Curated annotation (Swiss-Prot):
Region entry Disordered, spans: 528-558
One annotated Gene Ontology cellular component of this protein: cytosol
Keyword NAD appears in the UniProt entry: yes
Any one GO biological process: DNA repair
Protein name: DNA ligase
Residues of the BRCT domain: 746-823
GO MF annotation: an example: DNA ligase (NAD+) activity
Similarity section: Belongs to the NAD-dependent DNA ligase family. LigA subfamily.
CDD domains for the chain: BRCT_DNA_ligase_like, LIGANc
Length: 823
């Protein structure tokens, strides 16, 4: 073997092993940068010597040129379906497992009274595929199709990171056909839909549709970008290798061969009672899983017993798909009205006849926006399918048009010579006819906000309509103030939703800064008015109206506020020095969540720099695309928003500056921000060339008359001239590289880059406070424990996360030890 071929073999083996460690074991042994370096070396060698490329080369995971179509594949062993079993819940949440007990009895009868063990595993909501390996190398992948014939999706499947291109271990068979499910993890689905929205493309309805659509792309490069995942669940045929006697052994064999398993979410049990207990446990755990499942699959564990039981029609007797309670149900739309959010978003909401679905009674369901209402043609009186998945807001999925209420209406009928039914001069009157038409008209959003009567507007290209009233709208004002004071924003202790709603309803608070002008008389007035409204309420439900503002002392016949009022004022005062990220999040800038607010704080360090940041610079930052950057820049460009911030500063609010750990100047190099200038399309290479032609200065971009004509035409527009001047001023006032480095030195090197998980109740800090301390020191906080976790900080009543940390050998810290590390 020549040196080049040998090096290609070495790199292929190395990179496949590293990918297995990363995607399957969750325990990478080399840094990402080293993997990337080796990958690029292999790419270069294969590009120069394509004849030496190996069938299991990891470079195949990036996809290739588009196909004209998919070839058909006939399954040697048919891909059969499973019989379904259901366990409906009553309104108390109690399951009726009659169908599963019947399944267990059928199995026992088929085994002449034998006592079967069962394996129970997730029923993934994805796309079934079959993987064929010969001598350990993946040679073919096919979809289920009709069970007999599927489609060849080999090229696309090779882009799925956790599918081994070559099998691992000592017991690699000569041939094995692995059946399993391709799916998209919830986090990857959310990321995909975010990118779809930013690119102006239609989002996917659910992870299953996204996975199916991604796997069947003719262009495998698109599939490679979609981050699909695979879990195996059965062996269709096998020659050589380890011969399992039980299904649970097959699952262990999959792991040995290099496949991922849904660890912790399957098990082997002695009887049906234990199986059903695990099913109920998984139904509760379902919303927390990283992937979608719609039930559990129960299989007889013994492969010999499986063969003895055999098949009926197109399904095995030894397995059943135990579906979770229906998360869809039928009900009737009683009314449609709208809700106004804090950004003015107008959301149509269906008011429903109460229906029990997904474990709760649902009375309202979102209709999202006018386009969705029109597309589904939802009307008052319609019978509709309502879906609720996990903690997702219930939504109307579709209308059952056959049940739509109709009415008869008269129609004019011609007599054949041009006269209509109501024509007084007709010689021969026509017979009266009627036609059946819907009782209710199609729904349309109101022209004006039902709260403030401001016009409802919808910008071109936007799906969501918005109330134009801004903070003049009581609904927006209340929601905006609730968000501003919330725990993850300004964290004003003692000031809850009900108090804010009362303050807004009584016009005592109109703007954020008004919160810092509240005094005892204001709170007294609010309480007295709330009490009056309570006493006039037909139900006399004072607690509902006034919330927790209900306690007064009486001295000399005069009402005195008790501790609740002082607590509110103390909470307002103590919240005047928030972290910069919290303050930015509290402002309620459209598209700016906690993560984006943290990015802005880490990139600029001070509020003043964030306020002045130009849109092209913002668009260069990590996880901030053009849509979000435009929204941030638009917010700070509005005089009323700048005035609102100035009012807050004048009221004593002082957002804390922080060390710059993501220096904006490093991310926003000239070749990057030039490509993000609005209305000017250019590649990064050409942007770099333009920058060099301009003498590597913004002044040159502004004034050099030798620059290309398209650039000169762009800069001649007034708004672009102003933008370039803004960019010049902004970069001139940004900290130098030395200053940025000094800021980075403030990061705790013992914590920087480390991943922490918080669990249990800490003795002193709330979790948000502990998270803020860790992030300020340069660390990261994750919600789950893995081999990548550096520290678990455990308080009282720490549960499964602490157990997993101990099992994985992850360092466990107390709050005191965390503080020592941070110092």
């Amino acid at each position: 073997m020549n040196p080049t071929a040998q090096r290609i073999h070495e790199l292929t083996d190395l990179l496949n092993r590293y990918a297995y460690e990363y995607y399957t074991l969750d325990a990478p042994s080399i840094p990402d940068a080293e993997y990337d370096r080796l990958f690029r070396e292999l790419e270069a060698l294969e590009r120069n010597h394509p004849e030496l490329k190996l069938p299991d080369s990891p470079t195949q995971r990036v996809g290739g040129e588009p196909l004209a179509g998919f070839a058909e594949v006939r399954h040697e062993v048919p891909m059969l379906s499973l019989t379904n079993a259901f366990s409906p819940q009553d309104e108390n949440g109690v399951f009726d497992h009659a169908e599963m007990y019947a399944f267990d009895q059928r199995v026992r009868d088929g085994l002449d009274g034998g006592n079967p063990e069962y394996v129970i595993e997730p029923k993934f909501d994805g796309l079934a595929i079959s993987l064929l390996y010969r001598d350990g190398v993946l040679v073919q992948a096919a979809t289920r199709g009709d069970g007999t014939t599927g489609e060849d999706v080999t090229r696309n499947v090779k882009t799925v990171s956790n599918i081994p291109l070559r099998l691992h271990g000592e017991n690699v068979p000569e041939l094995i056909e692995v059946r399993g499910e391709v799916l998209m993890l919830k986090a990857d689905f959310a990321g995909l839909n975010k990118r779809q929205a930013e690119n102006g493309q239609k989002p996917f309805a659910n992870p299953r549709n996204a996975a199916a659509g991604s796997l069947r792309q003719l262009d495998s490069r698109i599939t490679a970008q979609r981050k699909l995942h695979f879990f195996p669940y059965s062996i269709a045929r096998q020659q050589g290798g380890f011969e399992a006697e039980e299904h649970i052994q097959e699952l262990a064999y999959f792991q040995e061969l290099g496949f991922s398993l849904p660890n912790g979410n399957f098990g082997c049990f002695k009887n049906i009672g234990e199986v059903l207990a695990f099913y109920e446990h998984m139904q509760q755990k379902r919303p927390e899983l990283p992937y979608e499942i719609d039930g559990m699959v129960v299989k007889v564990n013994s492969l010999a017993q499986q063969r003895e039981l055999g098949f009926i029609s197109r399904a095995p007797r030894w397995a059943v798909a135990h579906k979770f309670p229906a998360e869809e149900a039928l009900t009737i739309v009683e009314a449609i009205d709208v809700q106004i959010g804090r950004t003015g978003a107008v959301t149509p909401v269906a008011r429903l006849q109460p229906v029990f679905v997904g474990g709760v009674t649902v009375t309202n369901a979102t209709l999202h926006n006018q386009d969705e209402v029109s597309r589904k043609d939802v009307r008052v009186g319609d019978t509709v399918v309502v879906r609720r998945a996990g903690d997702v807001i219930p939504e109307v999925v579709r209308v059952i048009f056959e049940r739509r209420p109709m009415q008869e209406t008269a129609v004019a009928v011609s007599d054949g010579i041009g006269h209509q039914q109501d024509d007084l001069f007709a010689e021969t009157p026509s017979a009266k006819q009627t036609e059946s038409v819907p009782l209710h008209k199609p729904y349309r959003l109101p022209a004006r906000c039902p709260i403030c009567r401001s016009e409802i507007e919808r910008e071109e290209g936007e799906a969501v309509a918005r109330c134009s009233g801004g903070m003049l709208c009581q609904a927006q004002r209340a929601q905006g103030l609730i968000h501003f004071a919330s725990r993850k924003a300004m964290d004003i202790d003692g000031l809850g939703e009900k108090q804010i709603e009362q303050l807004v309803a009584q016009d005592l608070v109109r703007h954020f800064a008004d919160l810092y002008r509240i005094d005892i008389p204001t709170l007294q007035k609010m309480k007295e008015t709330a009490d009056k409204g309570s006493s006039e309420n037909e139900n006399g439900d004072a607690e509902t109206v006034s919330g927790d503002l209900s306690k007064y002392n009486t001295q000399n016949g005069k009402k005195q506020p008790t501790k609740w009022a002082q607590n509110i004022l103390a909470g307002i005062e103590s919240g005047k020095t928030p972290e910069l990220a919290r303050f930015l999040f509290a402002l309620g800038i459209r598209h700016v969540g906690e993560r984006t607010a943290k990015t802005l704080a880490q990139a600029f360090g001070t509020l003043e720099r964030v306020r002045r940041a130009p849109e092209p610079v913002l668009a260069c930052l990590p996880d901030i695309g053009t849509v979000v950057a435009r929204s941030i820049a638009h917010f700070f460009a509005q005089a009323e928003q700048q005035a609102m911030i100035d009012e807050l500063l004048a009221a004593g609010v002082a957002p804390q500056a922080q060390a710059v750990s993501l220096p904006a100047a490093q991310y926003a190099g000239p070749q990057r921000w030039i490509t993000r200038l609005p209305g000017f399309k250019i590649s990064e290479n050409k942007a770099q060339a333009l920058w060099e032609l301009a003498g590597q200065s913004i002044e040159g971009l502004q004034n050099d008359k030798a620059l290309p004509a398209d650039w000169q035409a762009w800069r001649s527009k007034a708004q672009n001239t102003a933008l370039l001047e803004n960019l010049k001023t902004f970069f001139a006032q940004m900290p130098s590289e030395d200053e940025a480095a000094q800021g980075s030195d403030g990061i705790n090197k013992a914590v920087a880059g480390k991943t922490f998980v918080l669990t249990g109740t800490l003795p002193t800090f709330k979790r948000d406070q502990a998270q803020a301390l860790i992030e300020a020191a340069g660390g990261k906080v994750s919600g789950s424990v893995s081999k990548k976790t550096d520290y678990v900080v455990a308080g009282e009543a720490a549960g499964s996360k602490l157990e997993k940390a101990n099992a994985l050998g992850v360092s466990v810290l107390s709050e005191a030890e965390l503080l020592t590390l941070l110092c």
